[in-house]
Amino acid sequence: MSLVPKAGYPFIIYFLDNINKYISDKTIQTYLTAFQINVDNLKVINKQFIPEAYRIIKLFTTNTTIMFAIYNYIFHGISKIGFLEKFSEEQIKYITDLETTDTKLIACAGSGKTRSVIGRIKFMVEHGLADKDEIYAITFSKHAATDFHRRIRELFPDYENFCQLKNFSTIDSMAKSILCRVKHHRSENVEILSIALRNFLKEATDEEINSITKFKIIKHLFIDEAQDLNNIQFDIALMFKKHFGTTIHLCGDPNQNIYQFRRSSNSYLMEFPAKKFELTLNFRSTQEIIDFSECLKPIATTRSVSGTNKIGPKVTIMTKQAIQIHKLILYFLKQYEKKNDLSNIAIICPTRGTGVNANTGLAMIFNFLKSNHIKVNQLYCESSSDERKRLVDRIPGHINLLTYHGTKGLEFDTVFVMDFYHSLLNIEPTYEEHNINQYLLYVATSRAISKMFICTYINNYGGYLNHWITKVDPKYYLIDSQPKIHKLTFRNEEIFDSNGVTELLEKLSEEDLYSIYELIKVNTFYEKRIFPDHTDIDRGKDEALYGIFCEELFYLCYYLNKKLEPRRFELIEKIVKSKFIIVENDLECNILKKFINTNNLTWTQFDQNKNNFRKDVIKLVEKYFSRNVELNDSIICTNDFINIVEANKIDIRDTYNRYLQPDKYQYNYNNIIFDLFYLVVVQYAYDINHYIYIK
């Protein structure tokens, strides 16, 4: 039995003397290759052998952790890099970096970015580059943080050896954990917490900074989805670096910056001065889908290719009338479910369609699926917070319906991308909306694994292929007809008051912010002036169902308290009296609702402004409306709405009659609250085109 050399120089000499014995070992090869040692140059004695041997000596002497790792593997059979077999060469290069400087990982869609970050943390801890208690990772939503935890557990069952799950959280959770210790702030509001932490760190004394280090040492901070950073969050990261010497690790895809409405910017990721790594292999999609989505990238990053060499059909673009597209989708679904689970399919729609109805496009698809008895897993809600509230669990036998924003981080075998660029309400985008649309399209078209269909509605009034899709090389897709290419024009930017919530919060002093915290904790309703009145801030045209219900409940309580009859529901009364204008399709319905209902248009107003209306609007009005009935005195709807309403008309009528007789429920809102909610649902279902809710 040969003697075991001591670790250090004796081992280095031993290793080089016995290089032929160990060079064929897979684990040894993985170690050496990860640190840019050319294993082939060590297999035979030649002129490349000596330079390569010197590189090994330098590696072992400057990175003793690596030397000890190989030593323990050879003599004790302990390997700390077996997990690298799960990763690609690009990922291994990032994971095994021996420098502990600032880094940024630029990763394409489907490249395994989060897995690589987890692998990097494991390698750093197990090779002595960092302590597990000093590594933190933050993301921007509870869903993302939960998903991070899930992936750690699935990837490495021994995760407790290299990470503290409590250190991997949302940015607001981290802010709260610091502020509640040093300032006793306990707000749940993300924006307030972020601004408060940023302000605190900017003004913190040495004593306050030292008090933080007593319970939280942040040596390494990984920021996932860093393309979604805003100025406040980036300032926090820089403050950590300034006060605690924190090493910053940004990870993200600059082409997936889809939360610009939250003031996020990919410039923080792109321009951050750090050691750069790239992941260009896409392990999700076929090369055909990758080629298509690559053409939609807003930022010219390194071109990505398939990491699996999977091939499949080209992307198919369908440009037909809505009813034809719906029939094709239905046929595909019926054929698909014969051998596969529908939960592997997603239909992706723009978050806000194009126009005043928040989810016009979603509603059209939702109603179509429901009317054809297709089970739907609705991965979105009608409020503006759909990213936070969306559910991500798939339901067997249910097709997934979600927004462009809601697709982030998800993947499906087959994807239908609904392209409503101009077809729903024919409203031109602003220049900013047009550019954001490119980011959204890239995200939506990079979700598919095997098959992808782009669906564009055409009609007599519009229906053009999305401008960005026309930039895709035709060799990357099949199309059923020559697409209509519209002339690219933009509507004027809407000018808003700068008094947005975030802007207002940023202006507040530390004392005013604390006052807000105290107000939020109060459970009773009262009024207190802590800042100049800004109640004129536009809340937007969207109202969540709960918000509408609360408003109606407020009015009901007010009238009942004064022993008055409740205020009436104009829409419900029209339903009861069957005042319907039935149009052929959702497109016509949406156009007429916008120009008549939204503006409460009368025949007199129509005649006075006729020259200012679009020709397609005039044609529709003349096609469906009679001068015997006032324009704004009817419900504009499709047969889908009629079919559902007629089946429930008696219930709606009886519910409304009960509601209008407060003496019979003793002017007590508790006795009528369920009826009130049902009436609100009917009204809401019509407003958002989700008629199925009426059931």
From Swiss-Prot:
Summarizing the function annotation, the protein's role is: ATP-dependent DNA helicase.
GO terms, biological process: recombinational repair
**Which Cys pairs does UniProt list as disulfide-bonded?**
none
Q: What is this protein called?
A: Putative ATP-dependent DNA helicase R568
Name the lineage.
Viruses, Varidnaviria, Bamfordvirae, Nucleocytoviricota, Megaviricetes
InterPro entries in the record, alphabetically? DNA_helicase_UvrD-like_C, DNA_helicase_UvrD/REP, P-loop_NTPase, UvrD-like_ATP-bd
Q: Which reaction does it catalyse?
A: Couples ATP hydrolysis with the unwinding of duplex DNA by translocating in the 3'-5' direction; ATP + H2O = ADP + phosphate + H(+)
UvrD-like helicase ATP-binding domain residues: 86-499
Keywords noted in UniProt? ATP-binding, Helicase, Hydrolase, Isomerase, Nucleotide-binding
